[in-house]
UniProtKB/Swiss-Prot annotation:
UniProt-annotated stretches for the region Disordered: 358-401
Domain notes for this protein: The SR/KY and BELL domains are responsive for the interaction between the TALE/BELL proteins and the TALE/KNOX proteins.
GO molecular function: DNA-binding transcription factor activity; transcription cis-regulatory region binding
Top-rank taxon, per record: Eukaryota
Keyword vocabulary terms for this entry: DNA-binding, Homeobox, Nucleus, Transcription, Transcription regulation
Pfam families: Homeobox_KN, POX
Protein's UniProt name: BEL1-like homeodomain protein 7
Subcellular location: Nucleus
DNA-binding annotation, residue ranges on this chain: 285-347
Subunit structure, interactors included: May form heterodimeric complexes with TALE/KNOX proteins.
UniProt keyword NADP present: no
Keyword match Nucleus: yes
Lineage start: Eukaryota, Viridiplantae, Streptophyta, Embryophyta, Tracheophyta
Length: 482
């Protein structure tokens, strides 16, 4: 039997029997006598112990709030058993909740013990750090990176004015490469995102809307974070190079990148034009040109005449000539192929022709004596044409053009062209007086009528003393080429 004591009296109220609606049955009986204070009151500690053993927490709070037991009226005394039952049921429910909470705390404590003692704990933490705590790791390392970048920027700002032209061009080429890499990173990220959206849509079609989100959200966030880190690193390098070049910082969007590229291209074009005007830089090889530069042709021609017996260079000679002339190896080889056909072969043919003609003249001296009347006839025709200043009568198969240029009173020069239709030959006779005097005499006329090949020409020179010197076409061609 459970007993309740009332302050100031020793009446004992019997508790009613257990009702089936209640969840617990209390059959304990308390026979312990409680010590009283000097005011004949029950000590509060004993009362709290009894009520706590019965689960009467709410009544214990009411006792503490009220401070003492108070007398009730008769109607309250009649209702006391019903209230006592209701209080008992609430106390039983609170005890159940406390028991459940205690069990839950015991289970959680058991789980924590097993997790801390597990051998998979470290591996799971590393996986979570890779997938979830990437931003935290970046934030931890970000201040050091910012400090390093600040130091680099200060050093570059101090050395901006001291950058030579070669390093500036190298930095510009590196900047263009980084910009192309940045575009490639953006393009690959767009491609990855598009493929991920295709996978998500296929999951949604089969399993329903939003079915792929638990599987693809984490992967998409991780890959996008990696792409973002890579893009930030490349952008940082681009900004550092721009600051080192002394240019203004452009925005990180596409417009800023396009404007910076246009600026770099414009700057390079202006520098190349300025160098070409000064003559420091040769024009690009891919531009159409009429032949090779004169300096390069002089070097190649000198090598050709030095190695006249073997006019085509070896591979090592080609590399050496390409370095000396500033041309490519293919251009050097093409020039020697053309020169061997156009210059070297005709010169060799003329040399052999001269040798054969000299041998014939030595073997046939009568032929040289027969040629002397022809020379005298040509000289007479020239004197007559100078007096008549017109065509020579009696010569039907020849056309003659005469041009006389006078310089001063004591010297003159006469040029006469004659082309014979029968033999197809051409003779040029120069009459010079007072050859001891020095000075240049202008000469004109007759050159535009030379339409025959140079291999069939014979040049005869007559001075005032009527000495004849025959000049072969090979010697003239050699002088022209050299």
């Amino acid at each position: 039997m459970a007993t309740y004591y009332k302050t100031g009296s020793s009446e004992i109220y019997s508790r009613p029997e257990f009702v089936p609606g209640n969840a617990m049955n209390y059959t304990n009986s308390f026979t312990e006598t409680f010590p009283r204070d000097s005011t004949n009151n029950v000590s509060p500690s004993k009362e709290i112990q009894v009520l706590s053993s019965l689960g009467g927490v709410s009544q214990m709070v009411e006792i503490q709030d009220s401070g003492s037991w108070r007398d009730q009226e008769d109607n309250d005394r009649n209702r006391f058993p019903v209230m006592r039952r209701l209080g008992l049921s609430s106390q039983i429910e609170t005890s159940r909740g406390n028991n459940n909470n205690e069990y839950a705390t015991q289970v959680v404590s058991g789980f924590t013990r097993t997790i801390h003692n597990s051998k998979y704990l470290k591996a799971a933490q590393e996986l979570l750090d890779e997938t979830v705590n990437v931003k935290k790791a970046l934030k931890q390392f970000q201040p050091e990176g910012d400090k390093i970048n600040e130091v680099k920027e200060k050093n570059l700002q101090t050395n901006t004015a001291e950058i030579p032209q070669a390093e500036r061009q190298e930095l510009q080429s590196k900047l263009s490469k980084l910009l192309s890499i940045l575009d490639e990173v953006d393009r690959n990220y767009k491609q990855y995102y598009h493929q991920m959206q295709i996978v998500v849509s296929s999951f949604d079609v089969i399993a329903g809307c939003g079915a792929a989100k638990p599987y693809t959200a984490l992967a998409l966030q991780t890959i996008s974070r990696h792409f973002r880190c890579l893009r930030d690193a490349i952008s940082g390098q681009i900004l550092v190079i721009r600051k080192s070049l002394g240019g203004e910082q452009d925005g990180s969007d596409g417009r800023g990148v396009g404007i910076s590229r246009l600026r770099n291209v414009d700057q390079q074009v202006r520098q190349q034009r300025a160098l070409q005007r000064l003559g420091v830089m040769q024009p690009h090889t891919w531009r159409p040109q009429r032949g090779l530069p004169d300096s390069s042709v002089l070097v190649l021609r000198a090598w050709l005449f030095e190695h006249f017996l073997h006019p085509y260079p070896k591979d090592s000679d080609k590399i050496m000539l390409a370095r000396q002339t500033g041309l490519s190896r293919g251009q050097v080889s093409n020039w020697f192929i053309n020169a061997r056909v156009r210059l070297w072969k005709p010169m060799v043919e003329e040399m052999y022709k001269e040798e054969f003609t000299d041998a014939l003249q030595e073997n046939d001296p009568n032929q040289s004596s027969e040629n002397t009347p022809e020379i005298t006839e040509i000289q007479e025709l020239q004197t007559e044409s100078s007096s008549n200043n017109g065509h020579v009568p009696g010569v039907a198969s020849s056309s003659m053009r005469q041009n006389t240029v006078a310089h001063g009173g004591d010297r003159f020069m006469m040029v006469t062209d004659m082309t014979r239709n029968g033999n197809g030959g051409m003779s040029l006779t120069l009459g010079i007086q007072n050859s001891d005097a020095r000075g240049d005499v202008p000469m004109s006329g007759g050159i535009d009528n030379y339409k025959n090949t140079i291999s069939g020409t014979d040049l005869q020179y007559l001075n005032s003393r009527n000495h004849q010197h025959q000049i072969g076409s090979s010697q003239l061609l050699h002088d022209f080429v050299a």
